[in-house]
């Protein structure tokens, strides 16, 4: 049984640094690369990173890397790997994905077939099974992925199962919701802290508000879901339970939060409430049905985060233009508030009425979007305290 694994956390383009910080916060050294964060760890690291990483897509084991310019090199390279340390007799091991980029080998179905054949042959040899008899595959599943970039093959096993953005709290979603891991990453990129008010004026199914409450309460995002590794015989149930129990103990149940989510659609507000209930944070968020232009607040030093409907999500261009203009008018008086708006509309700034202080390119799935960042005026600590005392 292996003691240490080469691991990667896959991540949407533009969010790698966020995941790198999360991995380091768990105590693992890492290297941040395009679309991935590399680190080493034991079985506990596999469990912890799946349970705790908010902004990653998946955690994968790198079984091996080798040059592969021909199918023979691919076969021999896959065959040479230590599959017996991962796959017990009876395991299901589909080659679930093959991706070839800038490589001599480019026929992905053939890459999958050759890789499968090599793993089968290795396991037949290790478990002393006759070559002519197919291996039974009726046990736990180990999804194998093959990536060939510039004639170098990387062979991986997915430990997560469904993508990590699936937290297990979403009862229903809106038309084109933001993914939970993207929302968590944007909150970490923003200047919001749990002691600041937070408003999402176009909250949809409530993702930003729910993820914010979970961050503030230090709730592990994977506590309410299961993972592929939980079925594997070399990951002990006792260790899984220990890590889950430890995570439950770390939840901050004392903190008081000021989070509000609004949406013009009453049905979405009800969905958001149900999602917050399922996530265990319904007491932390005030959801209400409201139009953007009706938003008013006397509070200071807050953060507005919005993923408003945009071109690809809403066919009504005139409606989008009007909404962005209203946002600009409503947000303008909130001088001490920072605003973060995620949209794919490249004309957003002109419709909103002011240039962003900073713009960050991200991908919501395959859709290129920009995070427009408007920073609020700095507030002295005593002013925030005064305002708090006035509220009490």
What is the predicted role of each segment?
Residues 144-160, 372:
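C-terminal edge-of-domain segments
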Residues 48, 53, 162-167, 171, ...:
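Flexible, glycine-/basic-rich loop-and-beta segments that form/coincide
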Residues 100-103, 162-163, 309-313:
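A short, flexible beta-alpha/helix-coil linker loop
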Residues 155-189:
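SAM-dependent Rossmann-like transferase core, predominantly class I methyltransferases
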Residues 2-142, 391-392:
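Non-catalytic nucleic-acid substrate-recognition regions in nucleic-acid-modifying enzymes
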């Amino acid at each position: 049984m292996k003691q240490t694994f080469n691991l990667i956390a896959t991540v949407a383009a533009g969010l790698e640094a966020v995941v790198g910080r999360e991995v380091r916060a768990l105590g693992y050294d890492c290297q941040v690369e395009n679309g991935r964060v590399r680190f080493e760890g034991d079985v506990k690291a596999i469990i912890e990173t799946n349970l705790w990483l908010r902004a990653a897509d998946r955690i994968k084991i790198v079984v091996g890397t080798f040059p592969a310019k021909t199918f023979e090199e691919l076969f021999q390279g896959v065959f040479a790997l230590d599959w017996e340390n991962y796959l017990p007799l009876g395991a299901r091991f589909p080659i679930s994905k093959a991706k070839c980029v800038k490589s001599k080998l480019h026929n992905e179905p053939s890459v999958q077939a050759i890789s499968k054949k090599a793993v089968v042959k290795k396991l037949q040899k290790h478990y002393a099974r006759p070559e002519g008899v197919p291996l039974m595959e009726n046990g736990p599943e180990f999804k194998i992925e093959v990536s060939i970039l510039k004639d170098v093959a990387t062979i991986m096993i997915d430990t997560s199962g469904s993508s990590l953005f699936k937290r297990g709290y979403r009862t229903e979603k809106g038309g084109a919701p933001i993914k939970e891991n993207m929302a968590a990453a944007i909150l970490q990129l923003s200047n919001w802290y749990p002691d600041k008010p937070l408003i999402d004026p176009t909250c949809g199914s409530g993702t930003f508000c729910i993820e914010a409450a979970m961050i503030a309460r230090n709730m592990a995002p994977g506590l309410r879901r299961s993972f592929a590794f939980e079925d594997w015989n070399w990951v002990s149930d006792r260790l899984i339970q220990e890590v889950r129990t430890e995570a439950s103990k770390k939840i901050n149940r004392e903190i008081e939060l000021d989070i509000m989510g609004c949406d013009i659609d009453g049905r979405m507000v009800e969905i958001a409430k149900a999602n917050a209930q399922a996530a265990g944070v319904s007491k932390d968020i005030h959801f209400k049905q409201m139009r953007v232009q009706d938003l008013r607040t006397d509070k200071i030093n807050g953060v507005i985060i919005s993923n408003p409907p945009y071109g690809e999500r809403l066919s009504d261009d005139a409606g989008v233009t009007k909404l962005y203009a209203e946002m600009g008018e409503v947000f303008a008086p909130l001088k001490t508030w920072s605003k973060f708006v995620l949209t794919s509309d490249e004309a957003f700034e002109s419709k909103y009425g002011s240039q962003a202080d900073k713009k960050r390119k991200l991908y919501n799935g395959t859709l290129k979007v920009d995070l427009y960042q408007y920073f609020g005026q700095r507030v002295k600590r005593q002013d925030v305290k005064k305002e708090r005392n006035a509220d009490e």
